UniProtKB/Swiss-Prot annotation:
This is Probable dual-specificity RNA methyltransferase RlmN. It is found in: Cytoplasm. It comes from Corynebacterium glutamicum (strain R). Belongs to the radical SAM superfamily. RlmN family. [4Fe-4S] cluster binds at C128, C132, C135.
Length: 366
């Protein structure tokens, strides 16, 4: 039997990138411009280029003095990531990008285009320390936290792609590599930049941003106290502690009841419905009694402020885990709904290009 991967909450300090414009607050940006001999009104111009026009190269910012553009580029706009592989599928509506960061670390994002919206799935860490055994990223371990700039620039890149196509990036989900609430301060700062109107941010509605977590209960409560209206998604995967201790090892620290209490606190503070993510795994967590228990526990803890997203498992190469058959999936949905909890099956865009957690990076590293 393989040795279990350990839980890691504190990311290694190594490898953080050079400081980027998005890493700094306005005071620090003004100070950086002052060091370049530029007045503070240039901040507004640069911000409008970055957040409004989605430009990250000061050499194209023609309203900046020509002699200062290279200096601004060198000081505030280092190259954070370069595309290593881009794969498209679902009739070119799904685009998976594997990015190589400045230190060689790999990062993934997935852009999914629908008829009525476009959604970007972004990463918050390079790797993940939560050690979930059915997740490719969790089994690969944690390399490091991403910087604010590395998170934000995933969004800018995708927004620029959509803009070039005549569309608009409408939704952001923190469901890529990493545990967002384990990189708390940077993720919250990134969310604020994603949602503030230009020139302070990209102007995407907070209600169109989803932050997922495996259940870091204190951080869920802390996020609630930020008084943002982002959607909270809790990766529960089973309603009983006995199995969840194995499927989601962080459950040994914060068990199901504590996670659901924190989720209720978030729902009460934000007024938002909480999303429960449940990867259905054949003969592991797909039993009728678990569906009944899930519905009962969620209805008791969250009432009408909950929705279950059932996720057909994306099998990882070489893994013993497999997706539950459709008939089992349909019965699971029926039983959860019968307990008074809305339950739907999540769209599986990107499965054929290994768009599930960390699979593309795992293949590249192999």
């Amino acid at each position: 039997m393989a040795t279990p991967v350990p839980l890691v909450f504190n990311a290694p300090k190594r490898g953080m990138p050079p400081t980027h414009f998005a890493d700094l607050n306005d005071e620090a940006r003004i100070e950086a411009l002052k060091e370049l001999g530029l007045p503070k009104f240039r901040l507004n111009q640069i911000a409008r280029h970055y957040y409004g026009r989605l430009e990250a190269d000061p050499l194209t910012m023609t309203d900046l003095p020509e002699g200062a553009r290279q200096e601004v580029k060198d000081a505030l706009f280092p190259t954070l990531m370069s595309p290593l592989r881009v794969i498209e599928t679902d009739d070119d509506t799904t685009q998976k990008t594997l990015w190589k960061l400045h230190d060689g670390t790999l990062l993934e994002s997935v852009l999914m285009r629908y008829s009525d919206r476009s959604t970007l799935c972004i990463s918050s860490q390079a790797g993940c320390g939560m050690a979930c055994p059915f997740c490719a990223t969790g089994q690969g371990g944690l390399d490091r936290n991403l910087s604010i700039g590395e998170i934000v620039d995933q969004v800018r890149n995708a927004a620029a792609t959509m803009q070039a196509e005549g569309g608009r990036l409408s939704n952001i989900v923190f469901m890529g590599m990493g545990e967002p609430l384990a990189n708390y301060k940077r993720v919250v700062s990134a969310v604020r930049q994603i949602t503030q109107p230009s020139p302070a941010g990209f102007g995407i509605s907070q209600r169109s941003v989803t932050v997922s977590t495996v259940g870091l209960a204190p951080a869920i409560r802390k996020l609630a106290d930020e008084e943002m209206s982002v959607t909270l998604a809790v990766s529960l995967h089973t309603p009983d502690d006995e199995l969840r201790d194995t499927l989601v090892p962080v459950n040994n620290r914060w068990p199901v009841a504590e996670v659901l209490d924190a989720a209720r606190y978030y729902a009460d503070k934000s007024g938002r419905r909480v999303s429960i993510e449940y990867a259905l795994i054949r003969d592991v967590n797909d039993q009728d009694w678990r569906a009944d228990m899930l519905g009962e526990k969620l209805h008791k803890a969250l009432g009408s402020r909950v929705h279950v997203n059932l996720i057909p498992l994306n099998p990882t190469p070489g893994s013993k885990w497999d997706a539950a058959p459709k008939a089992r999936q349909d019965e699971f949905v029926r039983r959860v709904i019968a307990k008074g909890v809305p339950c739907t099956v999540r769209d599986t865009k990107g499965q054929e290009i290994a768009a599930a957690c960390g699979q593309l990076a795992a293949e590249e590293s192999a």
